[in-house]
Regions:
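Conserved ATP-binding subdomain of kinase catalytic cores across diverse folds
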Residues: 1-69, 110-112, 152-153
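Catalytic activation segment of kinase domains across protein kinase-like and atypical kinase folds
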Residues: 18-21, 94-99, 103-152, 158-162
Length: 197
């Protein structure tokens, strides 16, 4: 991850201008977003969802294999996505990072968040702090980031409902809170330089 500032002034219609401009360089394990599944679901491209699930299994979730059942594959990938995104949220919160716009196009199913938009690091704990000037309701505020992640994962569950039963989707989503709090504890202890408590 790096930011290279240019000498140019940037004019934008959706943000105060002119502003300083920069190029953001980032690396991600994948660019398969929750929004990718939403689009396929919207157009009822269930065969393509199946292909994408198999692609994820072969390339990004190599510990998850199920040649016999697409249903089991979908359930396991969904569960792993919930755990990985909960882990990312724990790291983000402990670092004091405010993403700015946590929507389904900014979550990879492999657990990373990206396309940070108007991101910031907070100087002191403030759950209502927002990085985006347009976020008047605090939808993407520092304290609501885990809620935004759970909402995005709910959309992923809805996108996979042809393959996963509703009760399994709900049970899987219910694991987010536990995984998130485990991540918070782990990263807090690491940051403080103490053994896990």
């Amino acid at each position: 991850f790096s930011i290279i500032e240019t000498a140019e002034e940037l004019q934008r219609n959706d943000e105060p201008s002119p502003t300083r401009s920069a190029v953001l360089v980032r690396r991600s394990n994948s660019h398969i977003r929750i929004g990718t599944f939403q689009r396929l679901k919207y157009f009822k491209e269930y065969d393509n969802i199946a292909l994408l699930l198999n692609h994820l299994s072969e390339n990004y979730f190599t510990n998850i294999k199920s040649k016999k059942s697409l249903k089991i594959l979908a359930e396991n990938i969904f569960l792993e996505s919930v755990k990985r995104i909960a882990e990312s949220m724990g790291r983000i919160v402990i670092a004091g990072f405010v993403h700015g716009v946590l929507n389904t196009d900014n979550f990879n199913v492999t657990g990373e968040v990206f396309d940070y938009g108007p991101w910031r690091f907070i100087e002191f704990a403030n759950t209502s702090y927002t990085a985006a000037y347009f976020d008047n309701n605090g939808r993407y505020s520092f304290g609501r980031q885990p809620e935004a992640a759970l909402w995005a994962l709910t959309q992923l569950g809805k996108s996979l409902d042809e393959f996963i039963e509703e009760n399994i989707i709900i049970e899987t989503l219910n694991q987010f809170s536990k995984s998130f709090h485990e991540s918070l504890k782990k990263h807090f202890c690491w940051r403080m330089g103490i053994q896990d408590i």
